[in-house]
A protein has these predicted regions:
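Active-site neighborhood of glycoside hydrolase catalytic domains
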Residues: 283-294
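Active-site-adjacent structural elements in folded domains
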Residues: 49, 122-131, 176-181, 263-274
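Aromatic-rich carbohydrate-recognition surfaces in CAZymes
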Residues: 133, 137-139, 146-249, 253, ...
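Acidic/Ser/Thr-rich, low-complexity mid-to-C-terminal regulatory regions of eukaryotic proteins
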Residues: 254-279, 285
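Conserved small/polar residues in nucleotide/adenosyl-binding loops
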Residues: 297-303
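Active-site-adjacent bridging/hinge elements
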Residues: 31-38, 109-123, 163-173, 250-262
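Acidic/polar, glycine-enriched structural segments that form the non-catalytic walls/loops
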Residues: 1-132, 208-212, 223-231, 291
Length: 304
């Protein structure tokens, strides 16, 4: 890190022992197995500026607090940080409302995929750090399990709101790249999975406030997506005369089978992919239901 990011300040705290500077601070050319497994850059340098030395007599038990951080706001006591995090986990389990060990374990596991995105000021889903950030398809598929089944309805609203803001040419982003660059839209199914996520959101919540949120924030975007898919948008996505959606052409890979190596398309699926059209049918059903007086007649959504 210090070799590439000279301005980063690394802070190290310990409540015991002696901090001893290392003579050799870098171990270069280390191969990282996880990166190698995902065909990422697998070589890195290990920075070890200090060693912490403390006496430990035979039969002695000790708890040592060590904190290493690059954050501006930090807690020097690792035990206090751990206690705060455990209290947060307890609150998440209580909110989910399960009284089953496996379900509680999954509730906490789901939390690891959710993060606060500074650029939007809202929560988001990270598909797989450090390699993958926000992916539209993955987010919409996982939204039910990560947020709705765990009672995190506000986080679900945040996620739906974020992707609604970035609808472009009637398309939900495929992914938000690192470093804050513009979203990529090369997918036909992320927009369709968005309808599925919206439907599940209302299925789990269903209060007047939630219907009002969908009416004001989400429904206009759903209509925009439907119109774009019907009349045609980017990446050769359009509705044909039989009512089915055509997607993709040339080197474009717009389904989940999106492997491309140079000019070689591993799994070309141009035409009318079956799952895209199943999701298209679902999208039409969700939109039709929202256009009718479902549950709350005073919240009937306009169809024009």
């Amino acid at each position: 890190v210090p070799q590439q990011n000279k301005n980063i300040t690394i802070r190290l705290f310990t409540d015991d022992g002696t901090v001893v500077p290392c003579e050799e601070k870098y171990t270069t050319g280390m191969q990282l197995q996880k990166e190698l497994d995902v065909e990422s850059d697998a070589l890195d340098d290990n920075y070890t500026p200090y060693q912490i030395e403390f006496p430990l007599d035979a039969g002695c038990h000790k708890k040592i607090s060590i904190v290493c951080t690059i954050e501006d706001a930090y807690e020097k006591d690792a035990f206090a940080t751990a206690a705060t995090e455990m209290a947060r986990f307890d609150a998440l389990e209580k909110k989910a409302g399960y009284h089953d060990e496996l379900a509680e374990t999954l509730t906490i596991a789901a939390d690891h995929f959710l993060a606060y995105r500074q650029s939007t000021g809202l929560m988001t889903v990270l598909a797989g750090l450090p390699w993958f950030t926000d992916w539209g398809r993955d987010t919409m598929i996982a939204l039910t399990g990560l947020t709705l089944a765990t009672g995190r309805y506000q986080d679900a609203r945040d996620i739906l709101t974020t992707f609604a803001r970035y609808v472009h040419h009637g398309m939900v982003p495929n992914m938000f790249p690192d470093e804050g660059t513009a979203p990529l839209y090369n997918t036909a199914d992320a927009s369709m999975w968005y309808f599925y996520a919206v439907g599940k959101y209302l299925e789990y919540t269903g209060t007047p406030e939630d219907y009002a949120f969908v009416q004001e924030t989400i429904y206009p975007k759903l209509k925009e997506i439907i119109a774009a898919y019907e009349h045609g948008t980017d990446f050769s996505i359009y509705m044909e005369e039989d009512g089915l959606i055509h997607a993709g052409s040339g080197l474009d890979q717009v389904t989940w089978m999106d492997v491309r190596v140079g000019d070689w398309v591993a799994t070309p699926r141009h035409g009318k992919p079956v799952e895209i059209n199943a999701l298209w049918y679902n999208a039409l059903c969700v939109t039709a239901e929202l256009a009718e007086p479902v549950s709350y007649t005073h919240l009937t959504l306009p169809t024009t």
